[in-house]
Amino acid sequence: MLAAVCAVLFFVNGVLQLLLALGLPLGRFVLGGAYTVSPLLLRPVNLALFLAWFGCALAYLRYGSLLRRPLRERTARSIVYVSTLWLFIASVFNLFITTSDFERYVTGTLSTVACVLSMCLIWRRDRFQLCPCRISPHR
């Protein structure tokens, strides 16, 4: 369930990036609200971010055992760990540094919710692997 919600949040963020790449006036939600419409030079970046967020969503689905392919388990776990760190950094910037109210309250809330859910997912799924001092009973 947590993996599915995290994947949906990444899909939503990916759709936002796709709409920005297509030229819709949604720029208030990203980059501190500097642009209403994404400039032509940034649109390939928006498209790349769409693909990246789509890939992250697939990794969450794989990590949560909701998909069997296209990623290996180890790859999905690595992507989820890196994505969680990225969400934490993005949440700090979105909530405390940005000057855009849209980014602070909409995008910041989404990234914070996704970060907390992602941390809960990692804790629930890998809690025994997070403690490096744990001794295996098969010693």
Model regions: which residues?
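Membrane-helix boundary connector in multi-pass membrane proteins
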Residues: 91-106
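Alpha-helical transmembrane segments of integral membrane proteins, especially early/N-terminal helices
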Residues: 2-18, 107, 111-117
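Membrane-water interface at the C-terminal end of transmembrane alpha helices
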Residues: 113-130
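Loop-to-transmembrane helix junctions at the membrane interface
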Residues: 65-81
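Hydrophobic alpha-helical membrane segments
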Residues: 77-93
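Interfacial loop at the N-terminal end of multi-pass membrane proteins
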Residues: 3, 21-48, 66
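C-terminal TM-helix exit segments that contain a strictly Trp-centered aromatic cap at the helix terminus
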Residues: 14-24, 53-60, 94-97
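Core segments of transmembrane alpha-helices
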Residues: 46-57, 87-88, 111
